[in-house]
Amino acid sequence: MKRFDPRSLWRPVVWICRFRHRRGYGVHSPFAFQLITRVFYERGEFYAYRPLAVVRRTEACGQSERLDRLMLRLVNDVQPRRVVLWGDAVGVTRRYVEAGCRRARIDEVGCGALPAAKGYDMLYARRPADGLALFEAFAAQAPDRAVAVFEGIHRSRRRAAEWKAVCSHPRATVTFDLYDLGIVFLHPKLNSQHYLVNF
């Protein structure tokens, strides 16, 4: 039986406030529009959804199936070579990342510091205590076209302030605020833009 989460009562209010930011309306960048329509809002049945649903029933899950499926689609679109998973209880999310890109090397670092000079293409951070410091450590060693994903960016005022600081970082060019997740692209050739998405 699922535990009741009081934040679920707030979810309809958030959805109504973000209603005009759905499905890519008003987005003019081809890169951002493609990502919103073909990754965030993809409704097709991916090849790995059914086997991963079986795994999900047997293992402890850290986040919702909806967010894990989004991670699979994002990894499938980005195709990173090296991924680092930061935080506790990322086991099921790791399976989704592996299914999205089988050739990616995946490291789990728990809640410790990121290994220096590893050249990670993608960072997934589950509710980091200091998101800005973690992003700065990632951005210092990340190659161009890297991606950082932060979970729980609106869980508290402190995390929301950290998310704003991450968005204003010089290497963060395109950011997406999906309320539950924050996605940062480090693409130097793209114009700096911050998108609010009703996901």
Per-range role (PLM):
Residues M1-D144, H154-F199:
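A short alpha-helical cap/connector motif
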